[in-house]
Amino acid sequence: MQKQDQPVAFFDSGLRGISVLRETVRLLPQENYLYYGDSLHAPYGVKSEAQIQALSLAAAEHLVSAGAKAIVVACNTATSAAIGLLRQVYPDIPVIGTEPALKPAVEKYPGGRILVMATPMTIKQEKFQALKHQFDDRAQIIGLPCEGLMEFVERGELRGSAVEAYLTEKLAPYLREPVDGIVLGCTHYPFLTGAIRRIVGPGPEIMDGSHGVAMQLERKLAQSGMLRQCGEPGTAVFENSLDEPEILALSRALFRYRDE
């Protein structure tokens, strides 16, 4: 297999990174993709930094052995804890991380109120705090830890009374004092954009960083001459550490999901 035809590999603690994969496929449909969900060890967001680093290294090793030409860490928590380590271990492979779309939100709403929904671990991580500090003088940035929200996505529960009750409770203070933008700081959360919109109404813009990740991947592949030059769409293969038919079926369903 030629280098250009080798897959771009994604990994996440479960299924949430499929939201990043979907955006990447829209930008680079000709590429081949391999998605690895580590649902056996989910969620990463409540684990220690050392645990997340060990799990991330194991996932990356699996993907490299499968022939990955680039790795996308499709998880904000793993990016915060392990991206530097992964780049040290694999200096010859582009390793792309994800981070909340805080910069574009602040640029669009200078002096505004920006709510960042993320896992408790992401909110606590030094990487996020440094990013927040970078823009503190340009906008009011509010971190909202959402423990348990990702599990709704992992169950495929993207709408309905339970998830909307959870979101209503979390977002109630920001309905009384509205925000200008809501940054989805976890790659699970784009699947819940419709549910969030139904609660907050048409006012705040909902933003995530998936498109920025896809564009960065395109730049890295172009720089290294590894863009696949083919007029036909590529393939998308799904793997999961649980190796259960149900979770692989859910992975494919999320890949095709459209919310209104």
Regions of interest found by a model, annotated:
Residues M1-E260:
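Non-catalytic structural scaffold of enzyme domains
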